[in-house]
Amino acid sequence: MTHPPSLLCIGLTTVDVVALPVRLEPFDGVRLIDAVQMAPAGTAAGTALVAAKLRVATQLAGAVGPDAAGRFIRGELIHAGVDVALLEVLPGLPTSATLIPIDAAGNRMIYHSPGAAALMSLSNALKTAAASASAVHYAGVGARNLDGHAAEFLAPAKARGALITCDLIAPGPNSAAELRRLLPYIDVFMPSAVEARFVTGESDLPRAAQALRDWGAGAIVIKNGADGALALDKAGRLGVVPAVKIDRVVDTTSCGDSFCAGFIAATLRGRPWGQALRFAAATASLVARGPATLGVLESYEQADSIAAPASG
């Protein structure tokens, strides 16, 4: 990276193939649809792509295969200005890919092939990058070579004063134990409502947020779709971040990743907690208005113009 502030995103890197609008029912034959779009995606790569669109100097650490999908991801990220020096190519493995048919109402089905993404390595170069970044977004919970070792790069980054955020994707039976290990190094943990309930066993979101904070995270933001987000700050104050109302939802697949990117981008620009969360919600709303990872997001200023005004 050439200039601060810098963000390092670590973890899931995939390509999303979005088809819309479709009828989510079995059929035999050919149907014409409006669009098929491809984009780099995933809790790490999607966040990196959106952050770069918001003019954050961003680097991605992840893994792809030596195939057309991997070359596409790399090329699109480079075109967007993302540093891909830490994007590994793993021989003999396919790139992670996700097929997402979406109907006219925004409902979707998701078909995911894990591929190389979960097998990224814990390298010295990754540790060095984490130690120098202004912010680290960790989206690697469940990665075989990272679970149990995240503290090796998160602890030095936190000691340096970097902003450390974390998100989940499809948590499994070992995710809660991994979170108990790494949340003491996390400033803001940002799971979805489904993920928060799964890992804590709490159906009540405020109780889930408190449980996650008790595991060591500085603050918790639980993303809850059209209901906005539940935020528990580092002082223990609980609040709700309303979702930005939009006329038509097109594709919500990357809304969680874009929320994270928006929060990080605003925080790195010095926005206080409340303003950063509202900017995050505005960013997610722009992504929901169009297909694939970026939706109709064009710039930081565009998102800022629709963020709800308040004192912070």
What residue ranges belong to the model's regions?
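Conserved phosphate-binding/catalytic loop of the ribokinase/pfkB sugar-kinase fold
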Residues: 89, 100-144
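A generic structural signal for short hydrophobic patches within well-formed alpha-helices
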Residues: 125, 196-197, 229, 303
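Hydrophobic beta-strand scaffold residues
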Residues: 58, 84, 164-165
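A glycine-rich helix N-cap at a beta->alpha junction
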Residues: 76-93
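Conserved beta-alpha-beta core of the PfkB/ribokinase-like small-molecule kinase fold
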Residues: 135-210, 227-228
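Short beta-strand scaffold segments in enzyme catalytic cores
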Residues: 49, 97-101, 109, 228-232
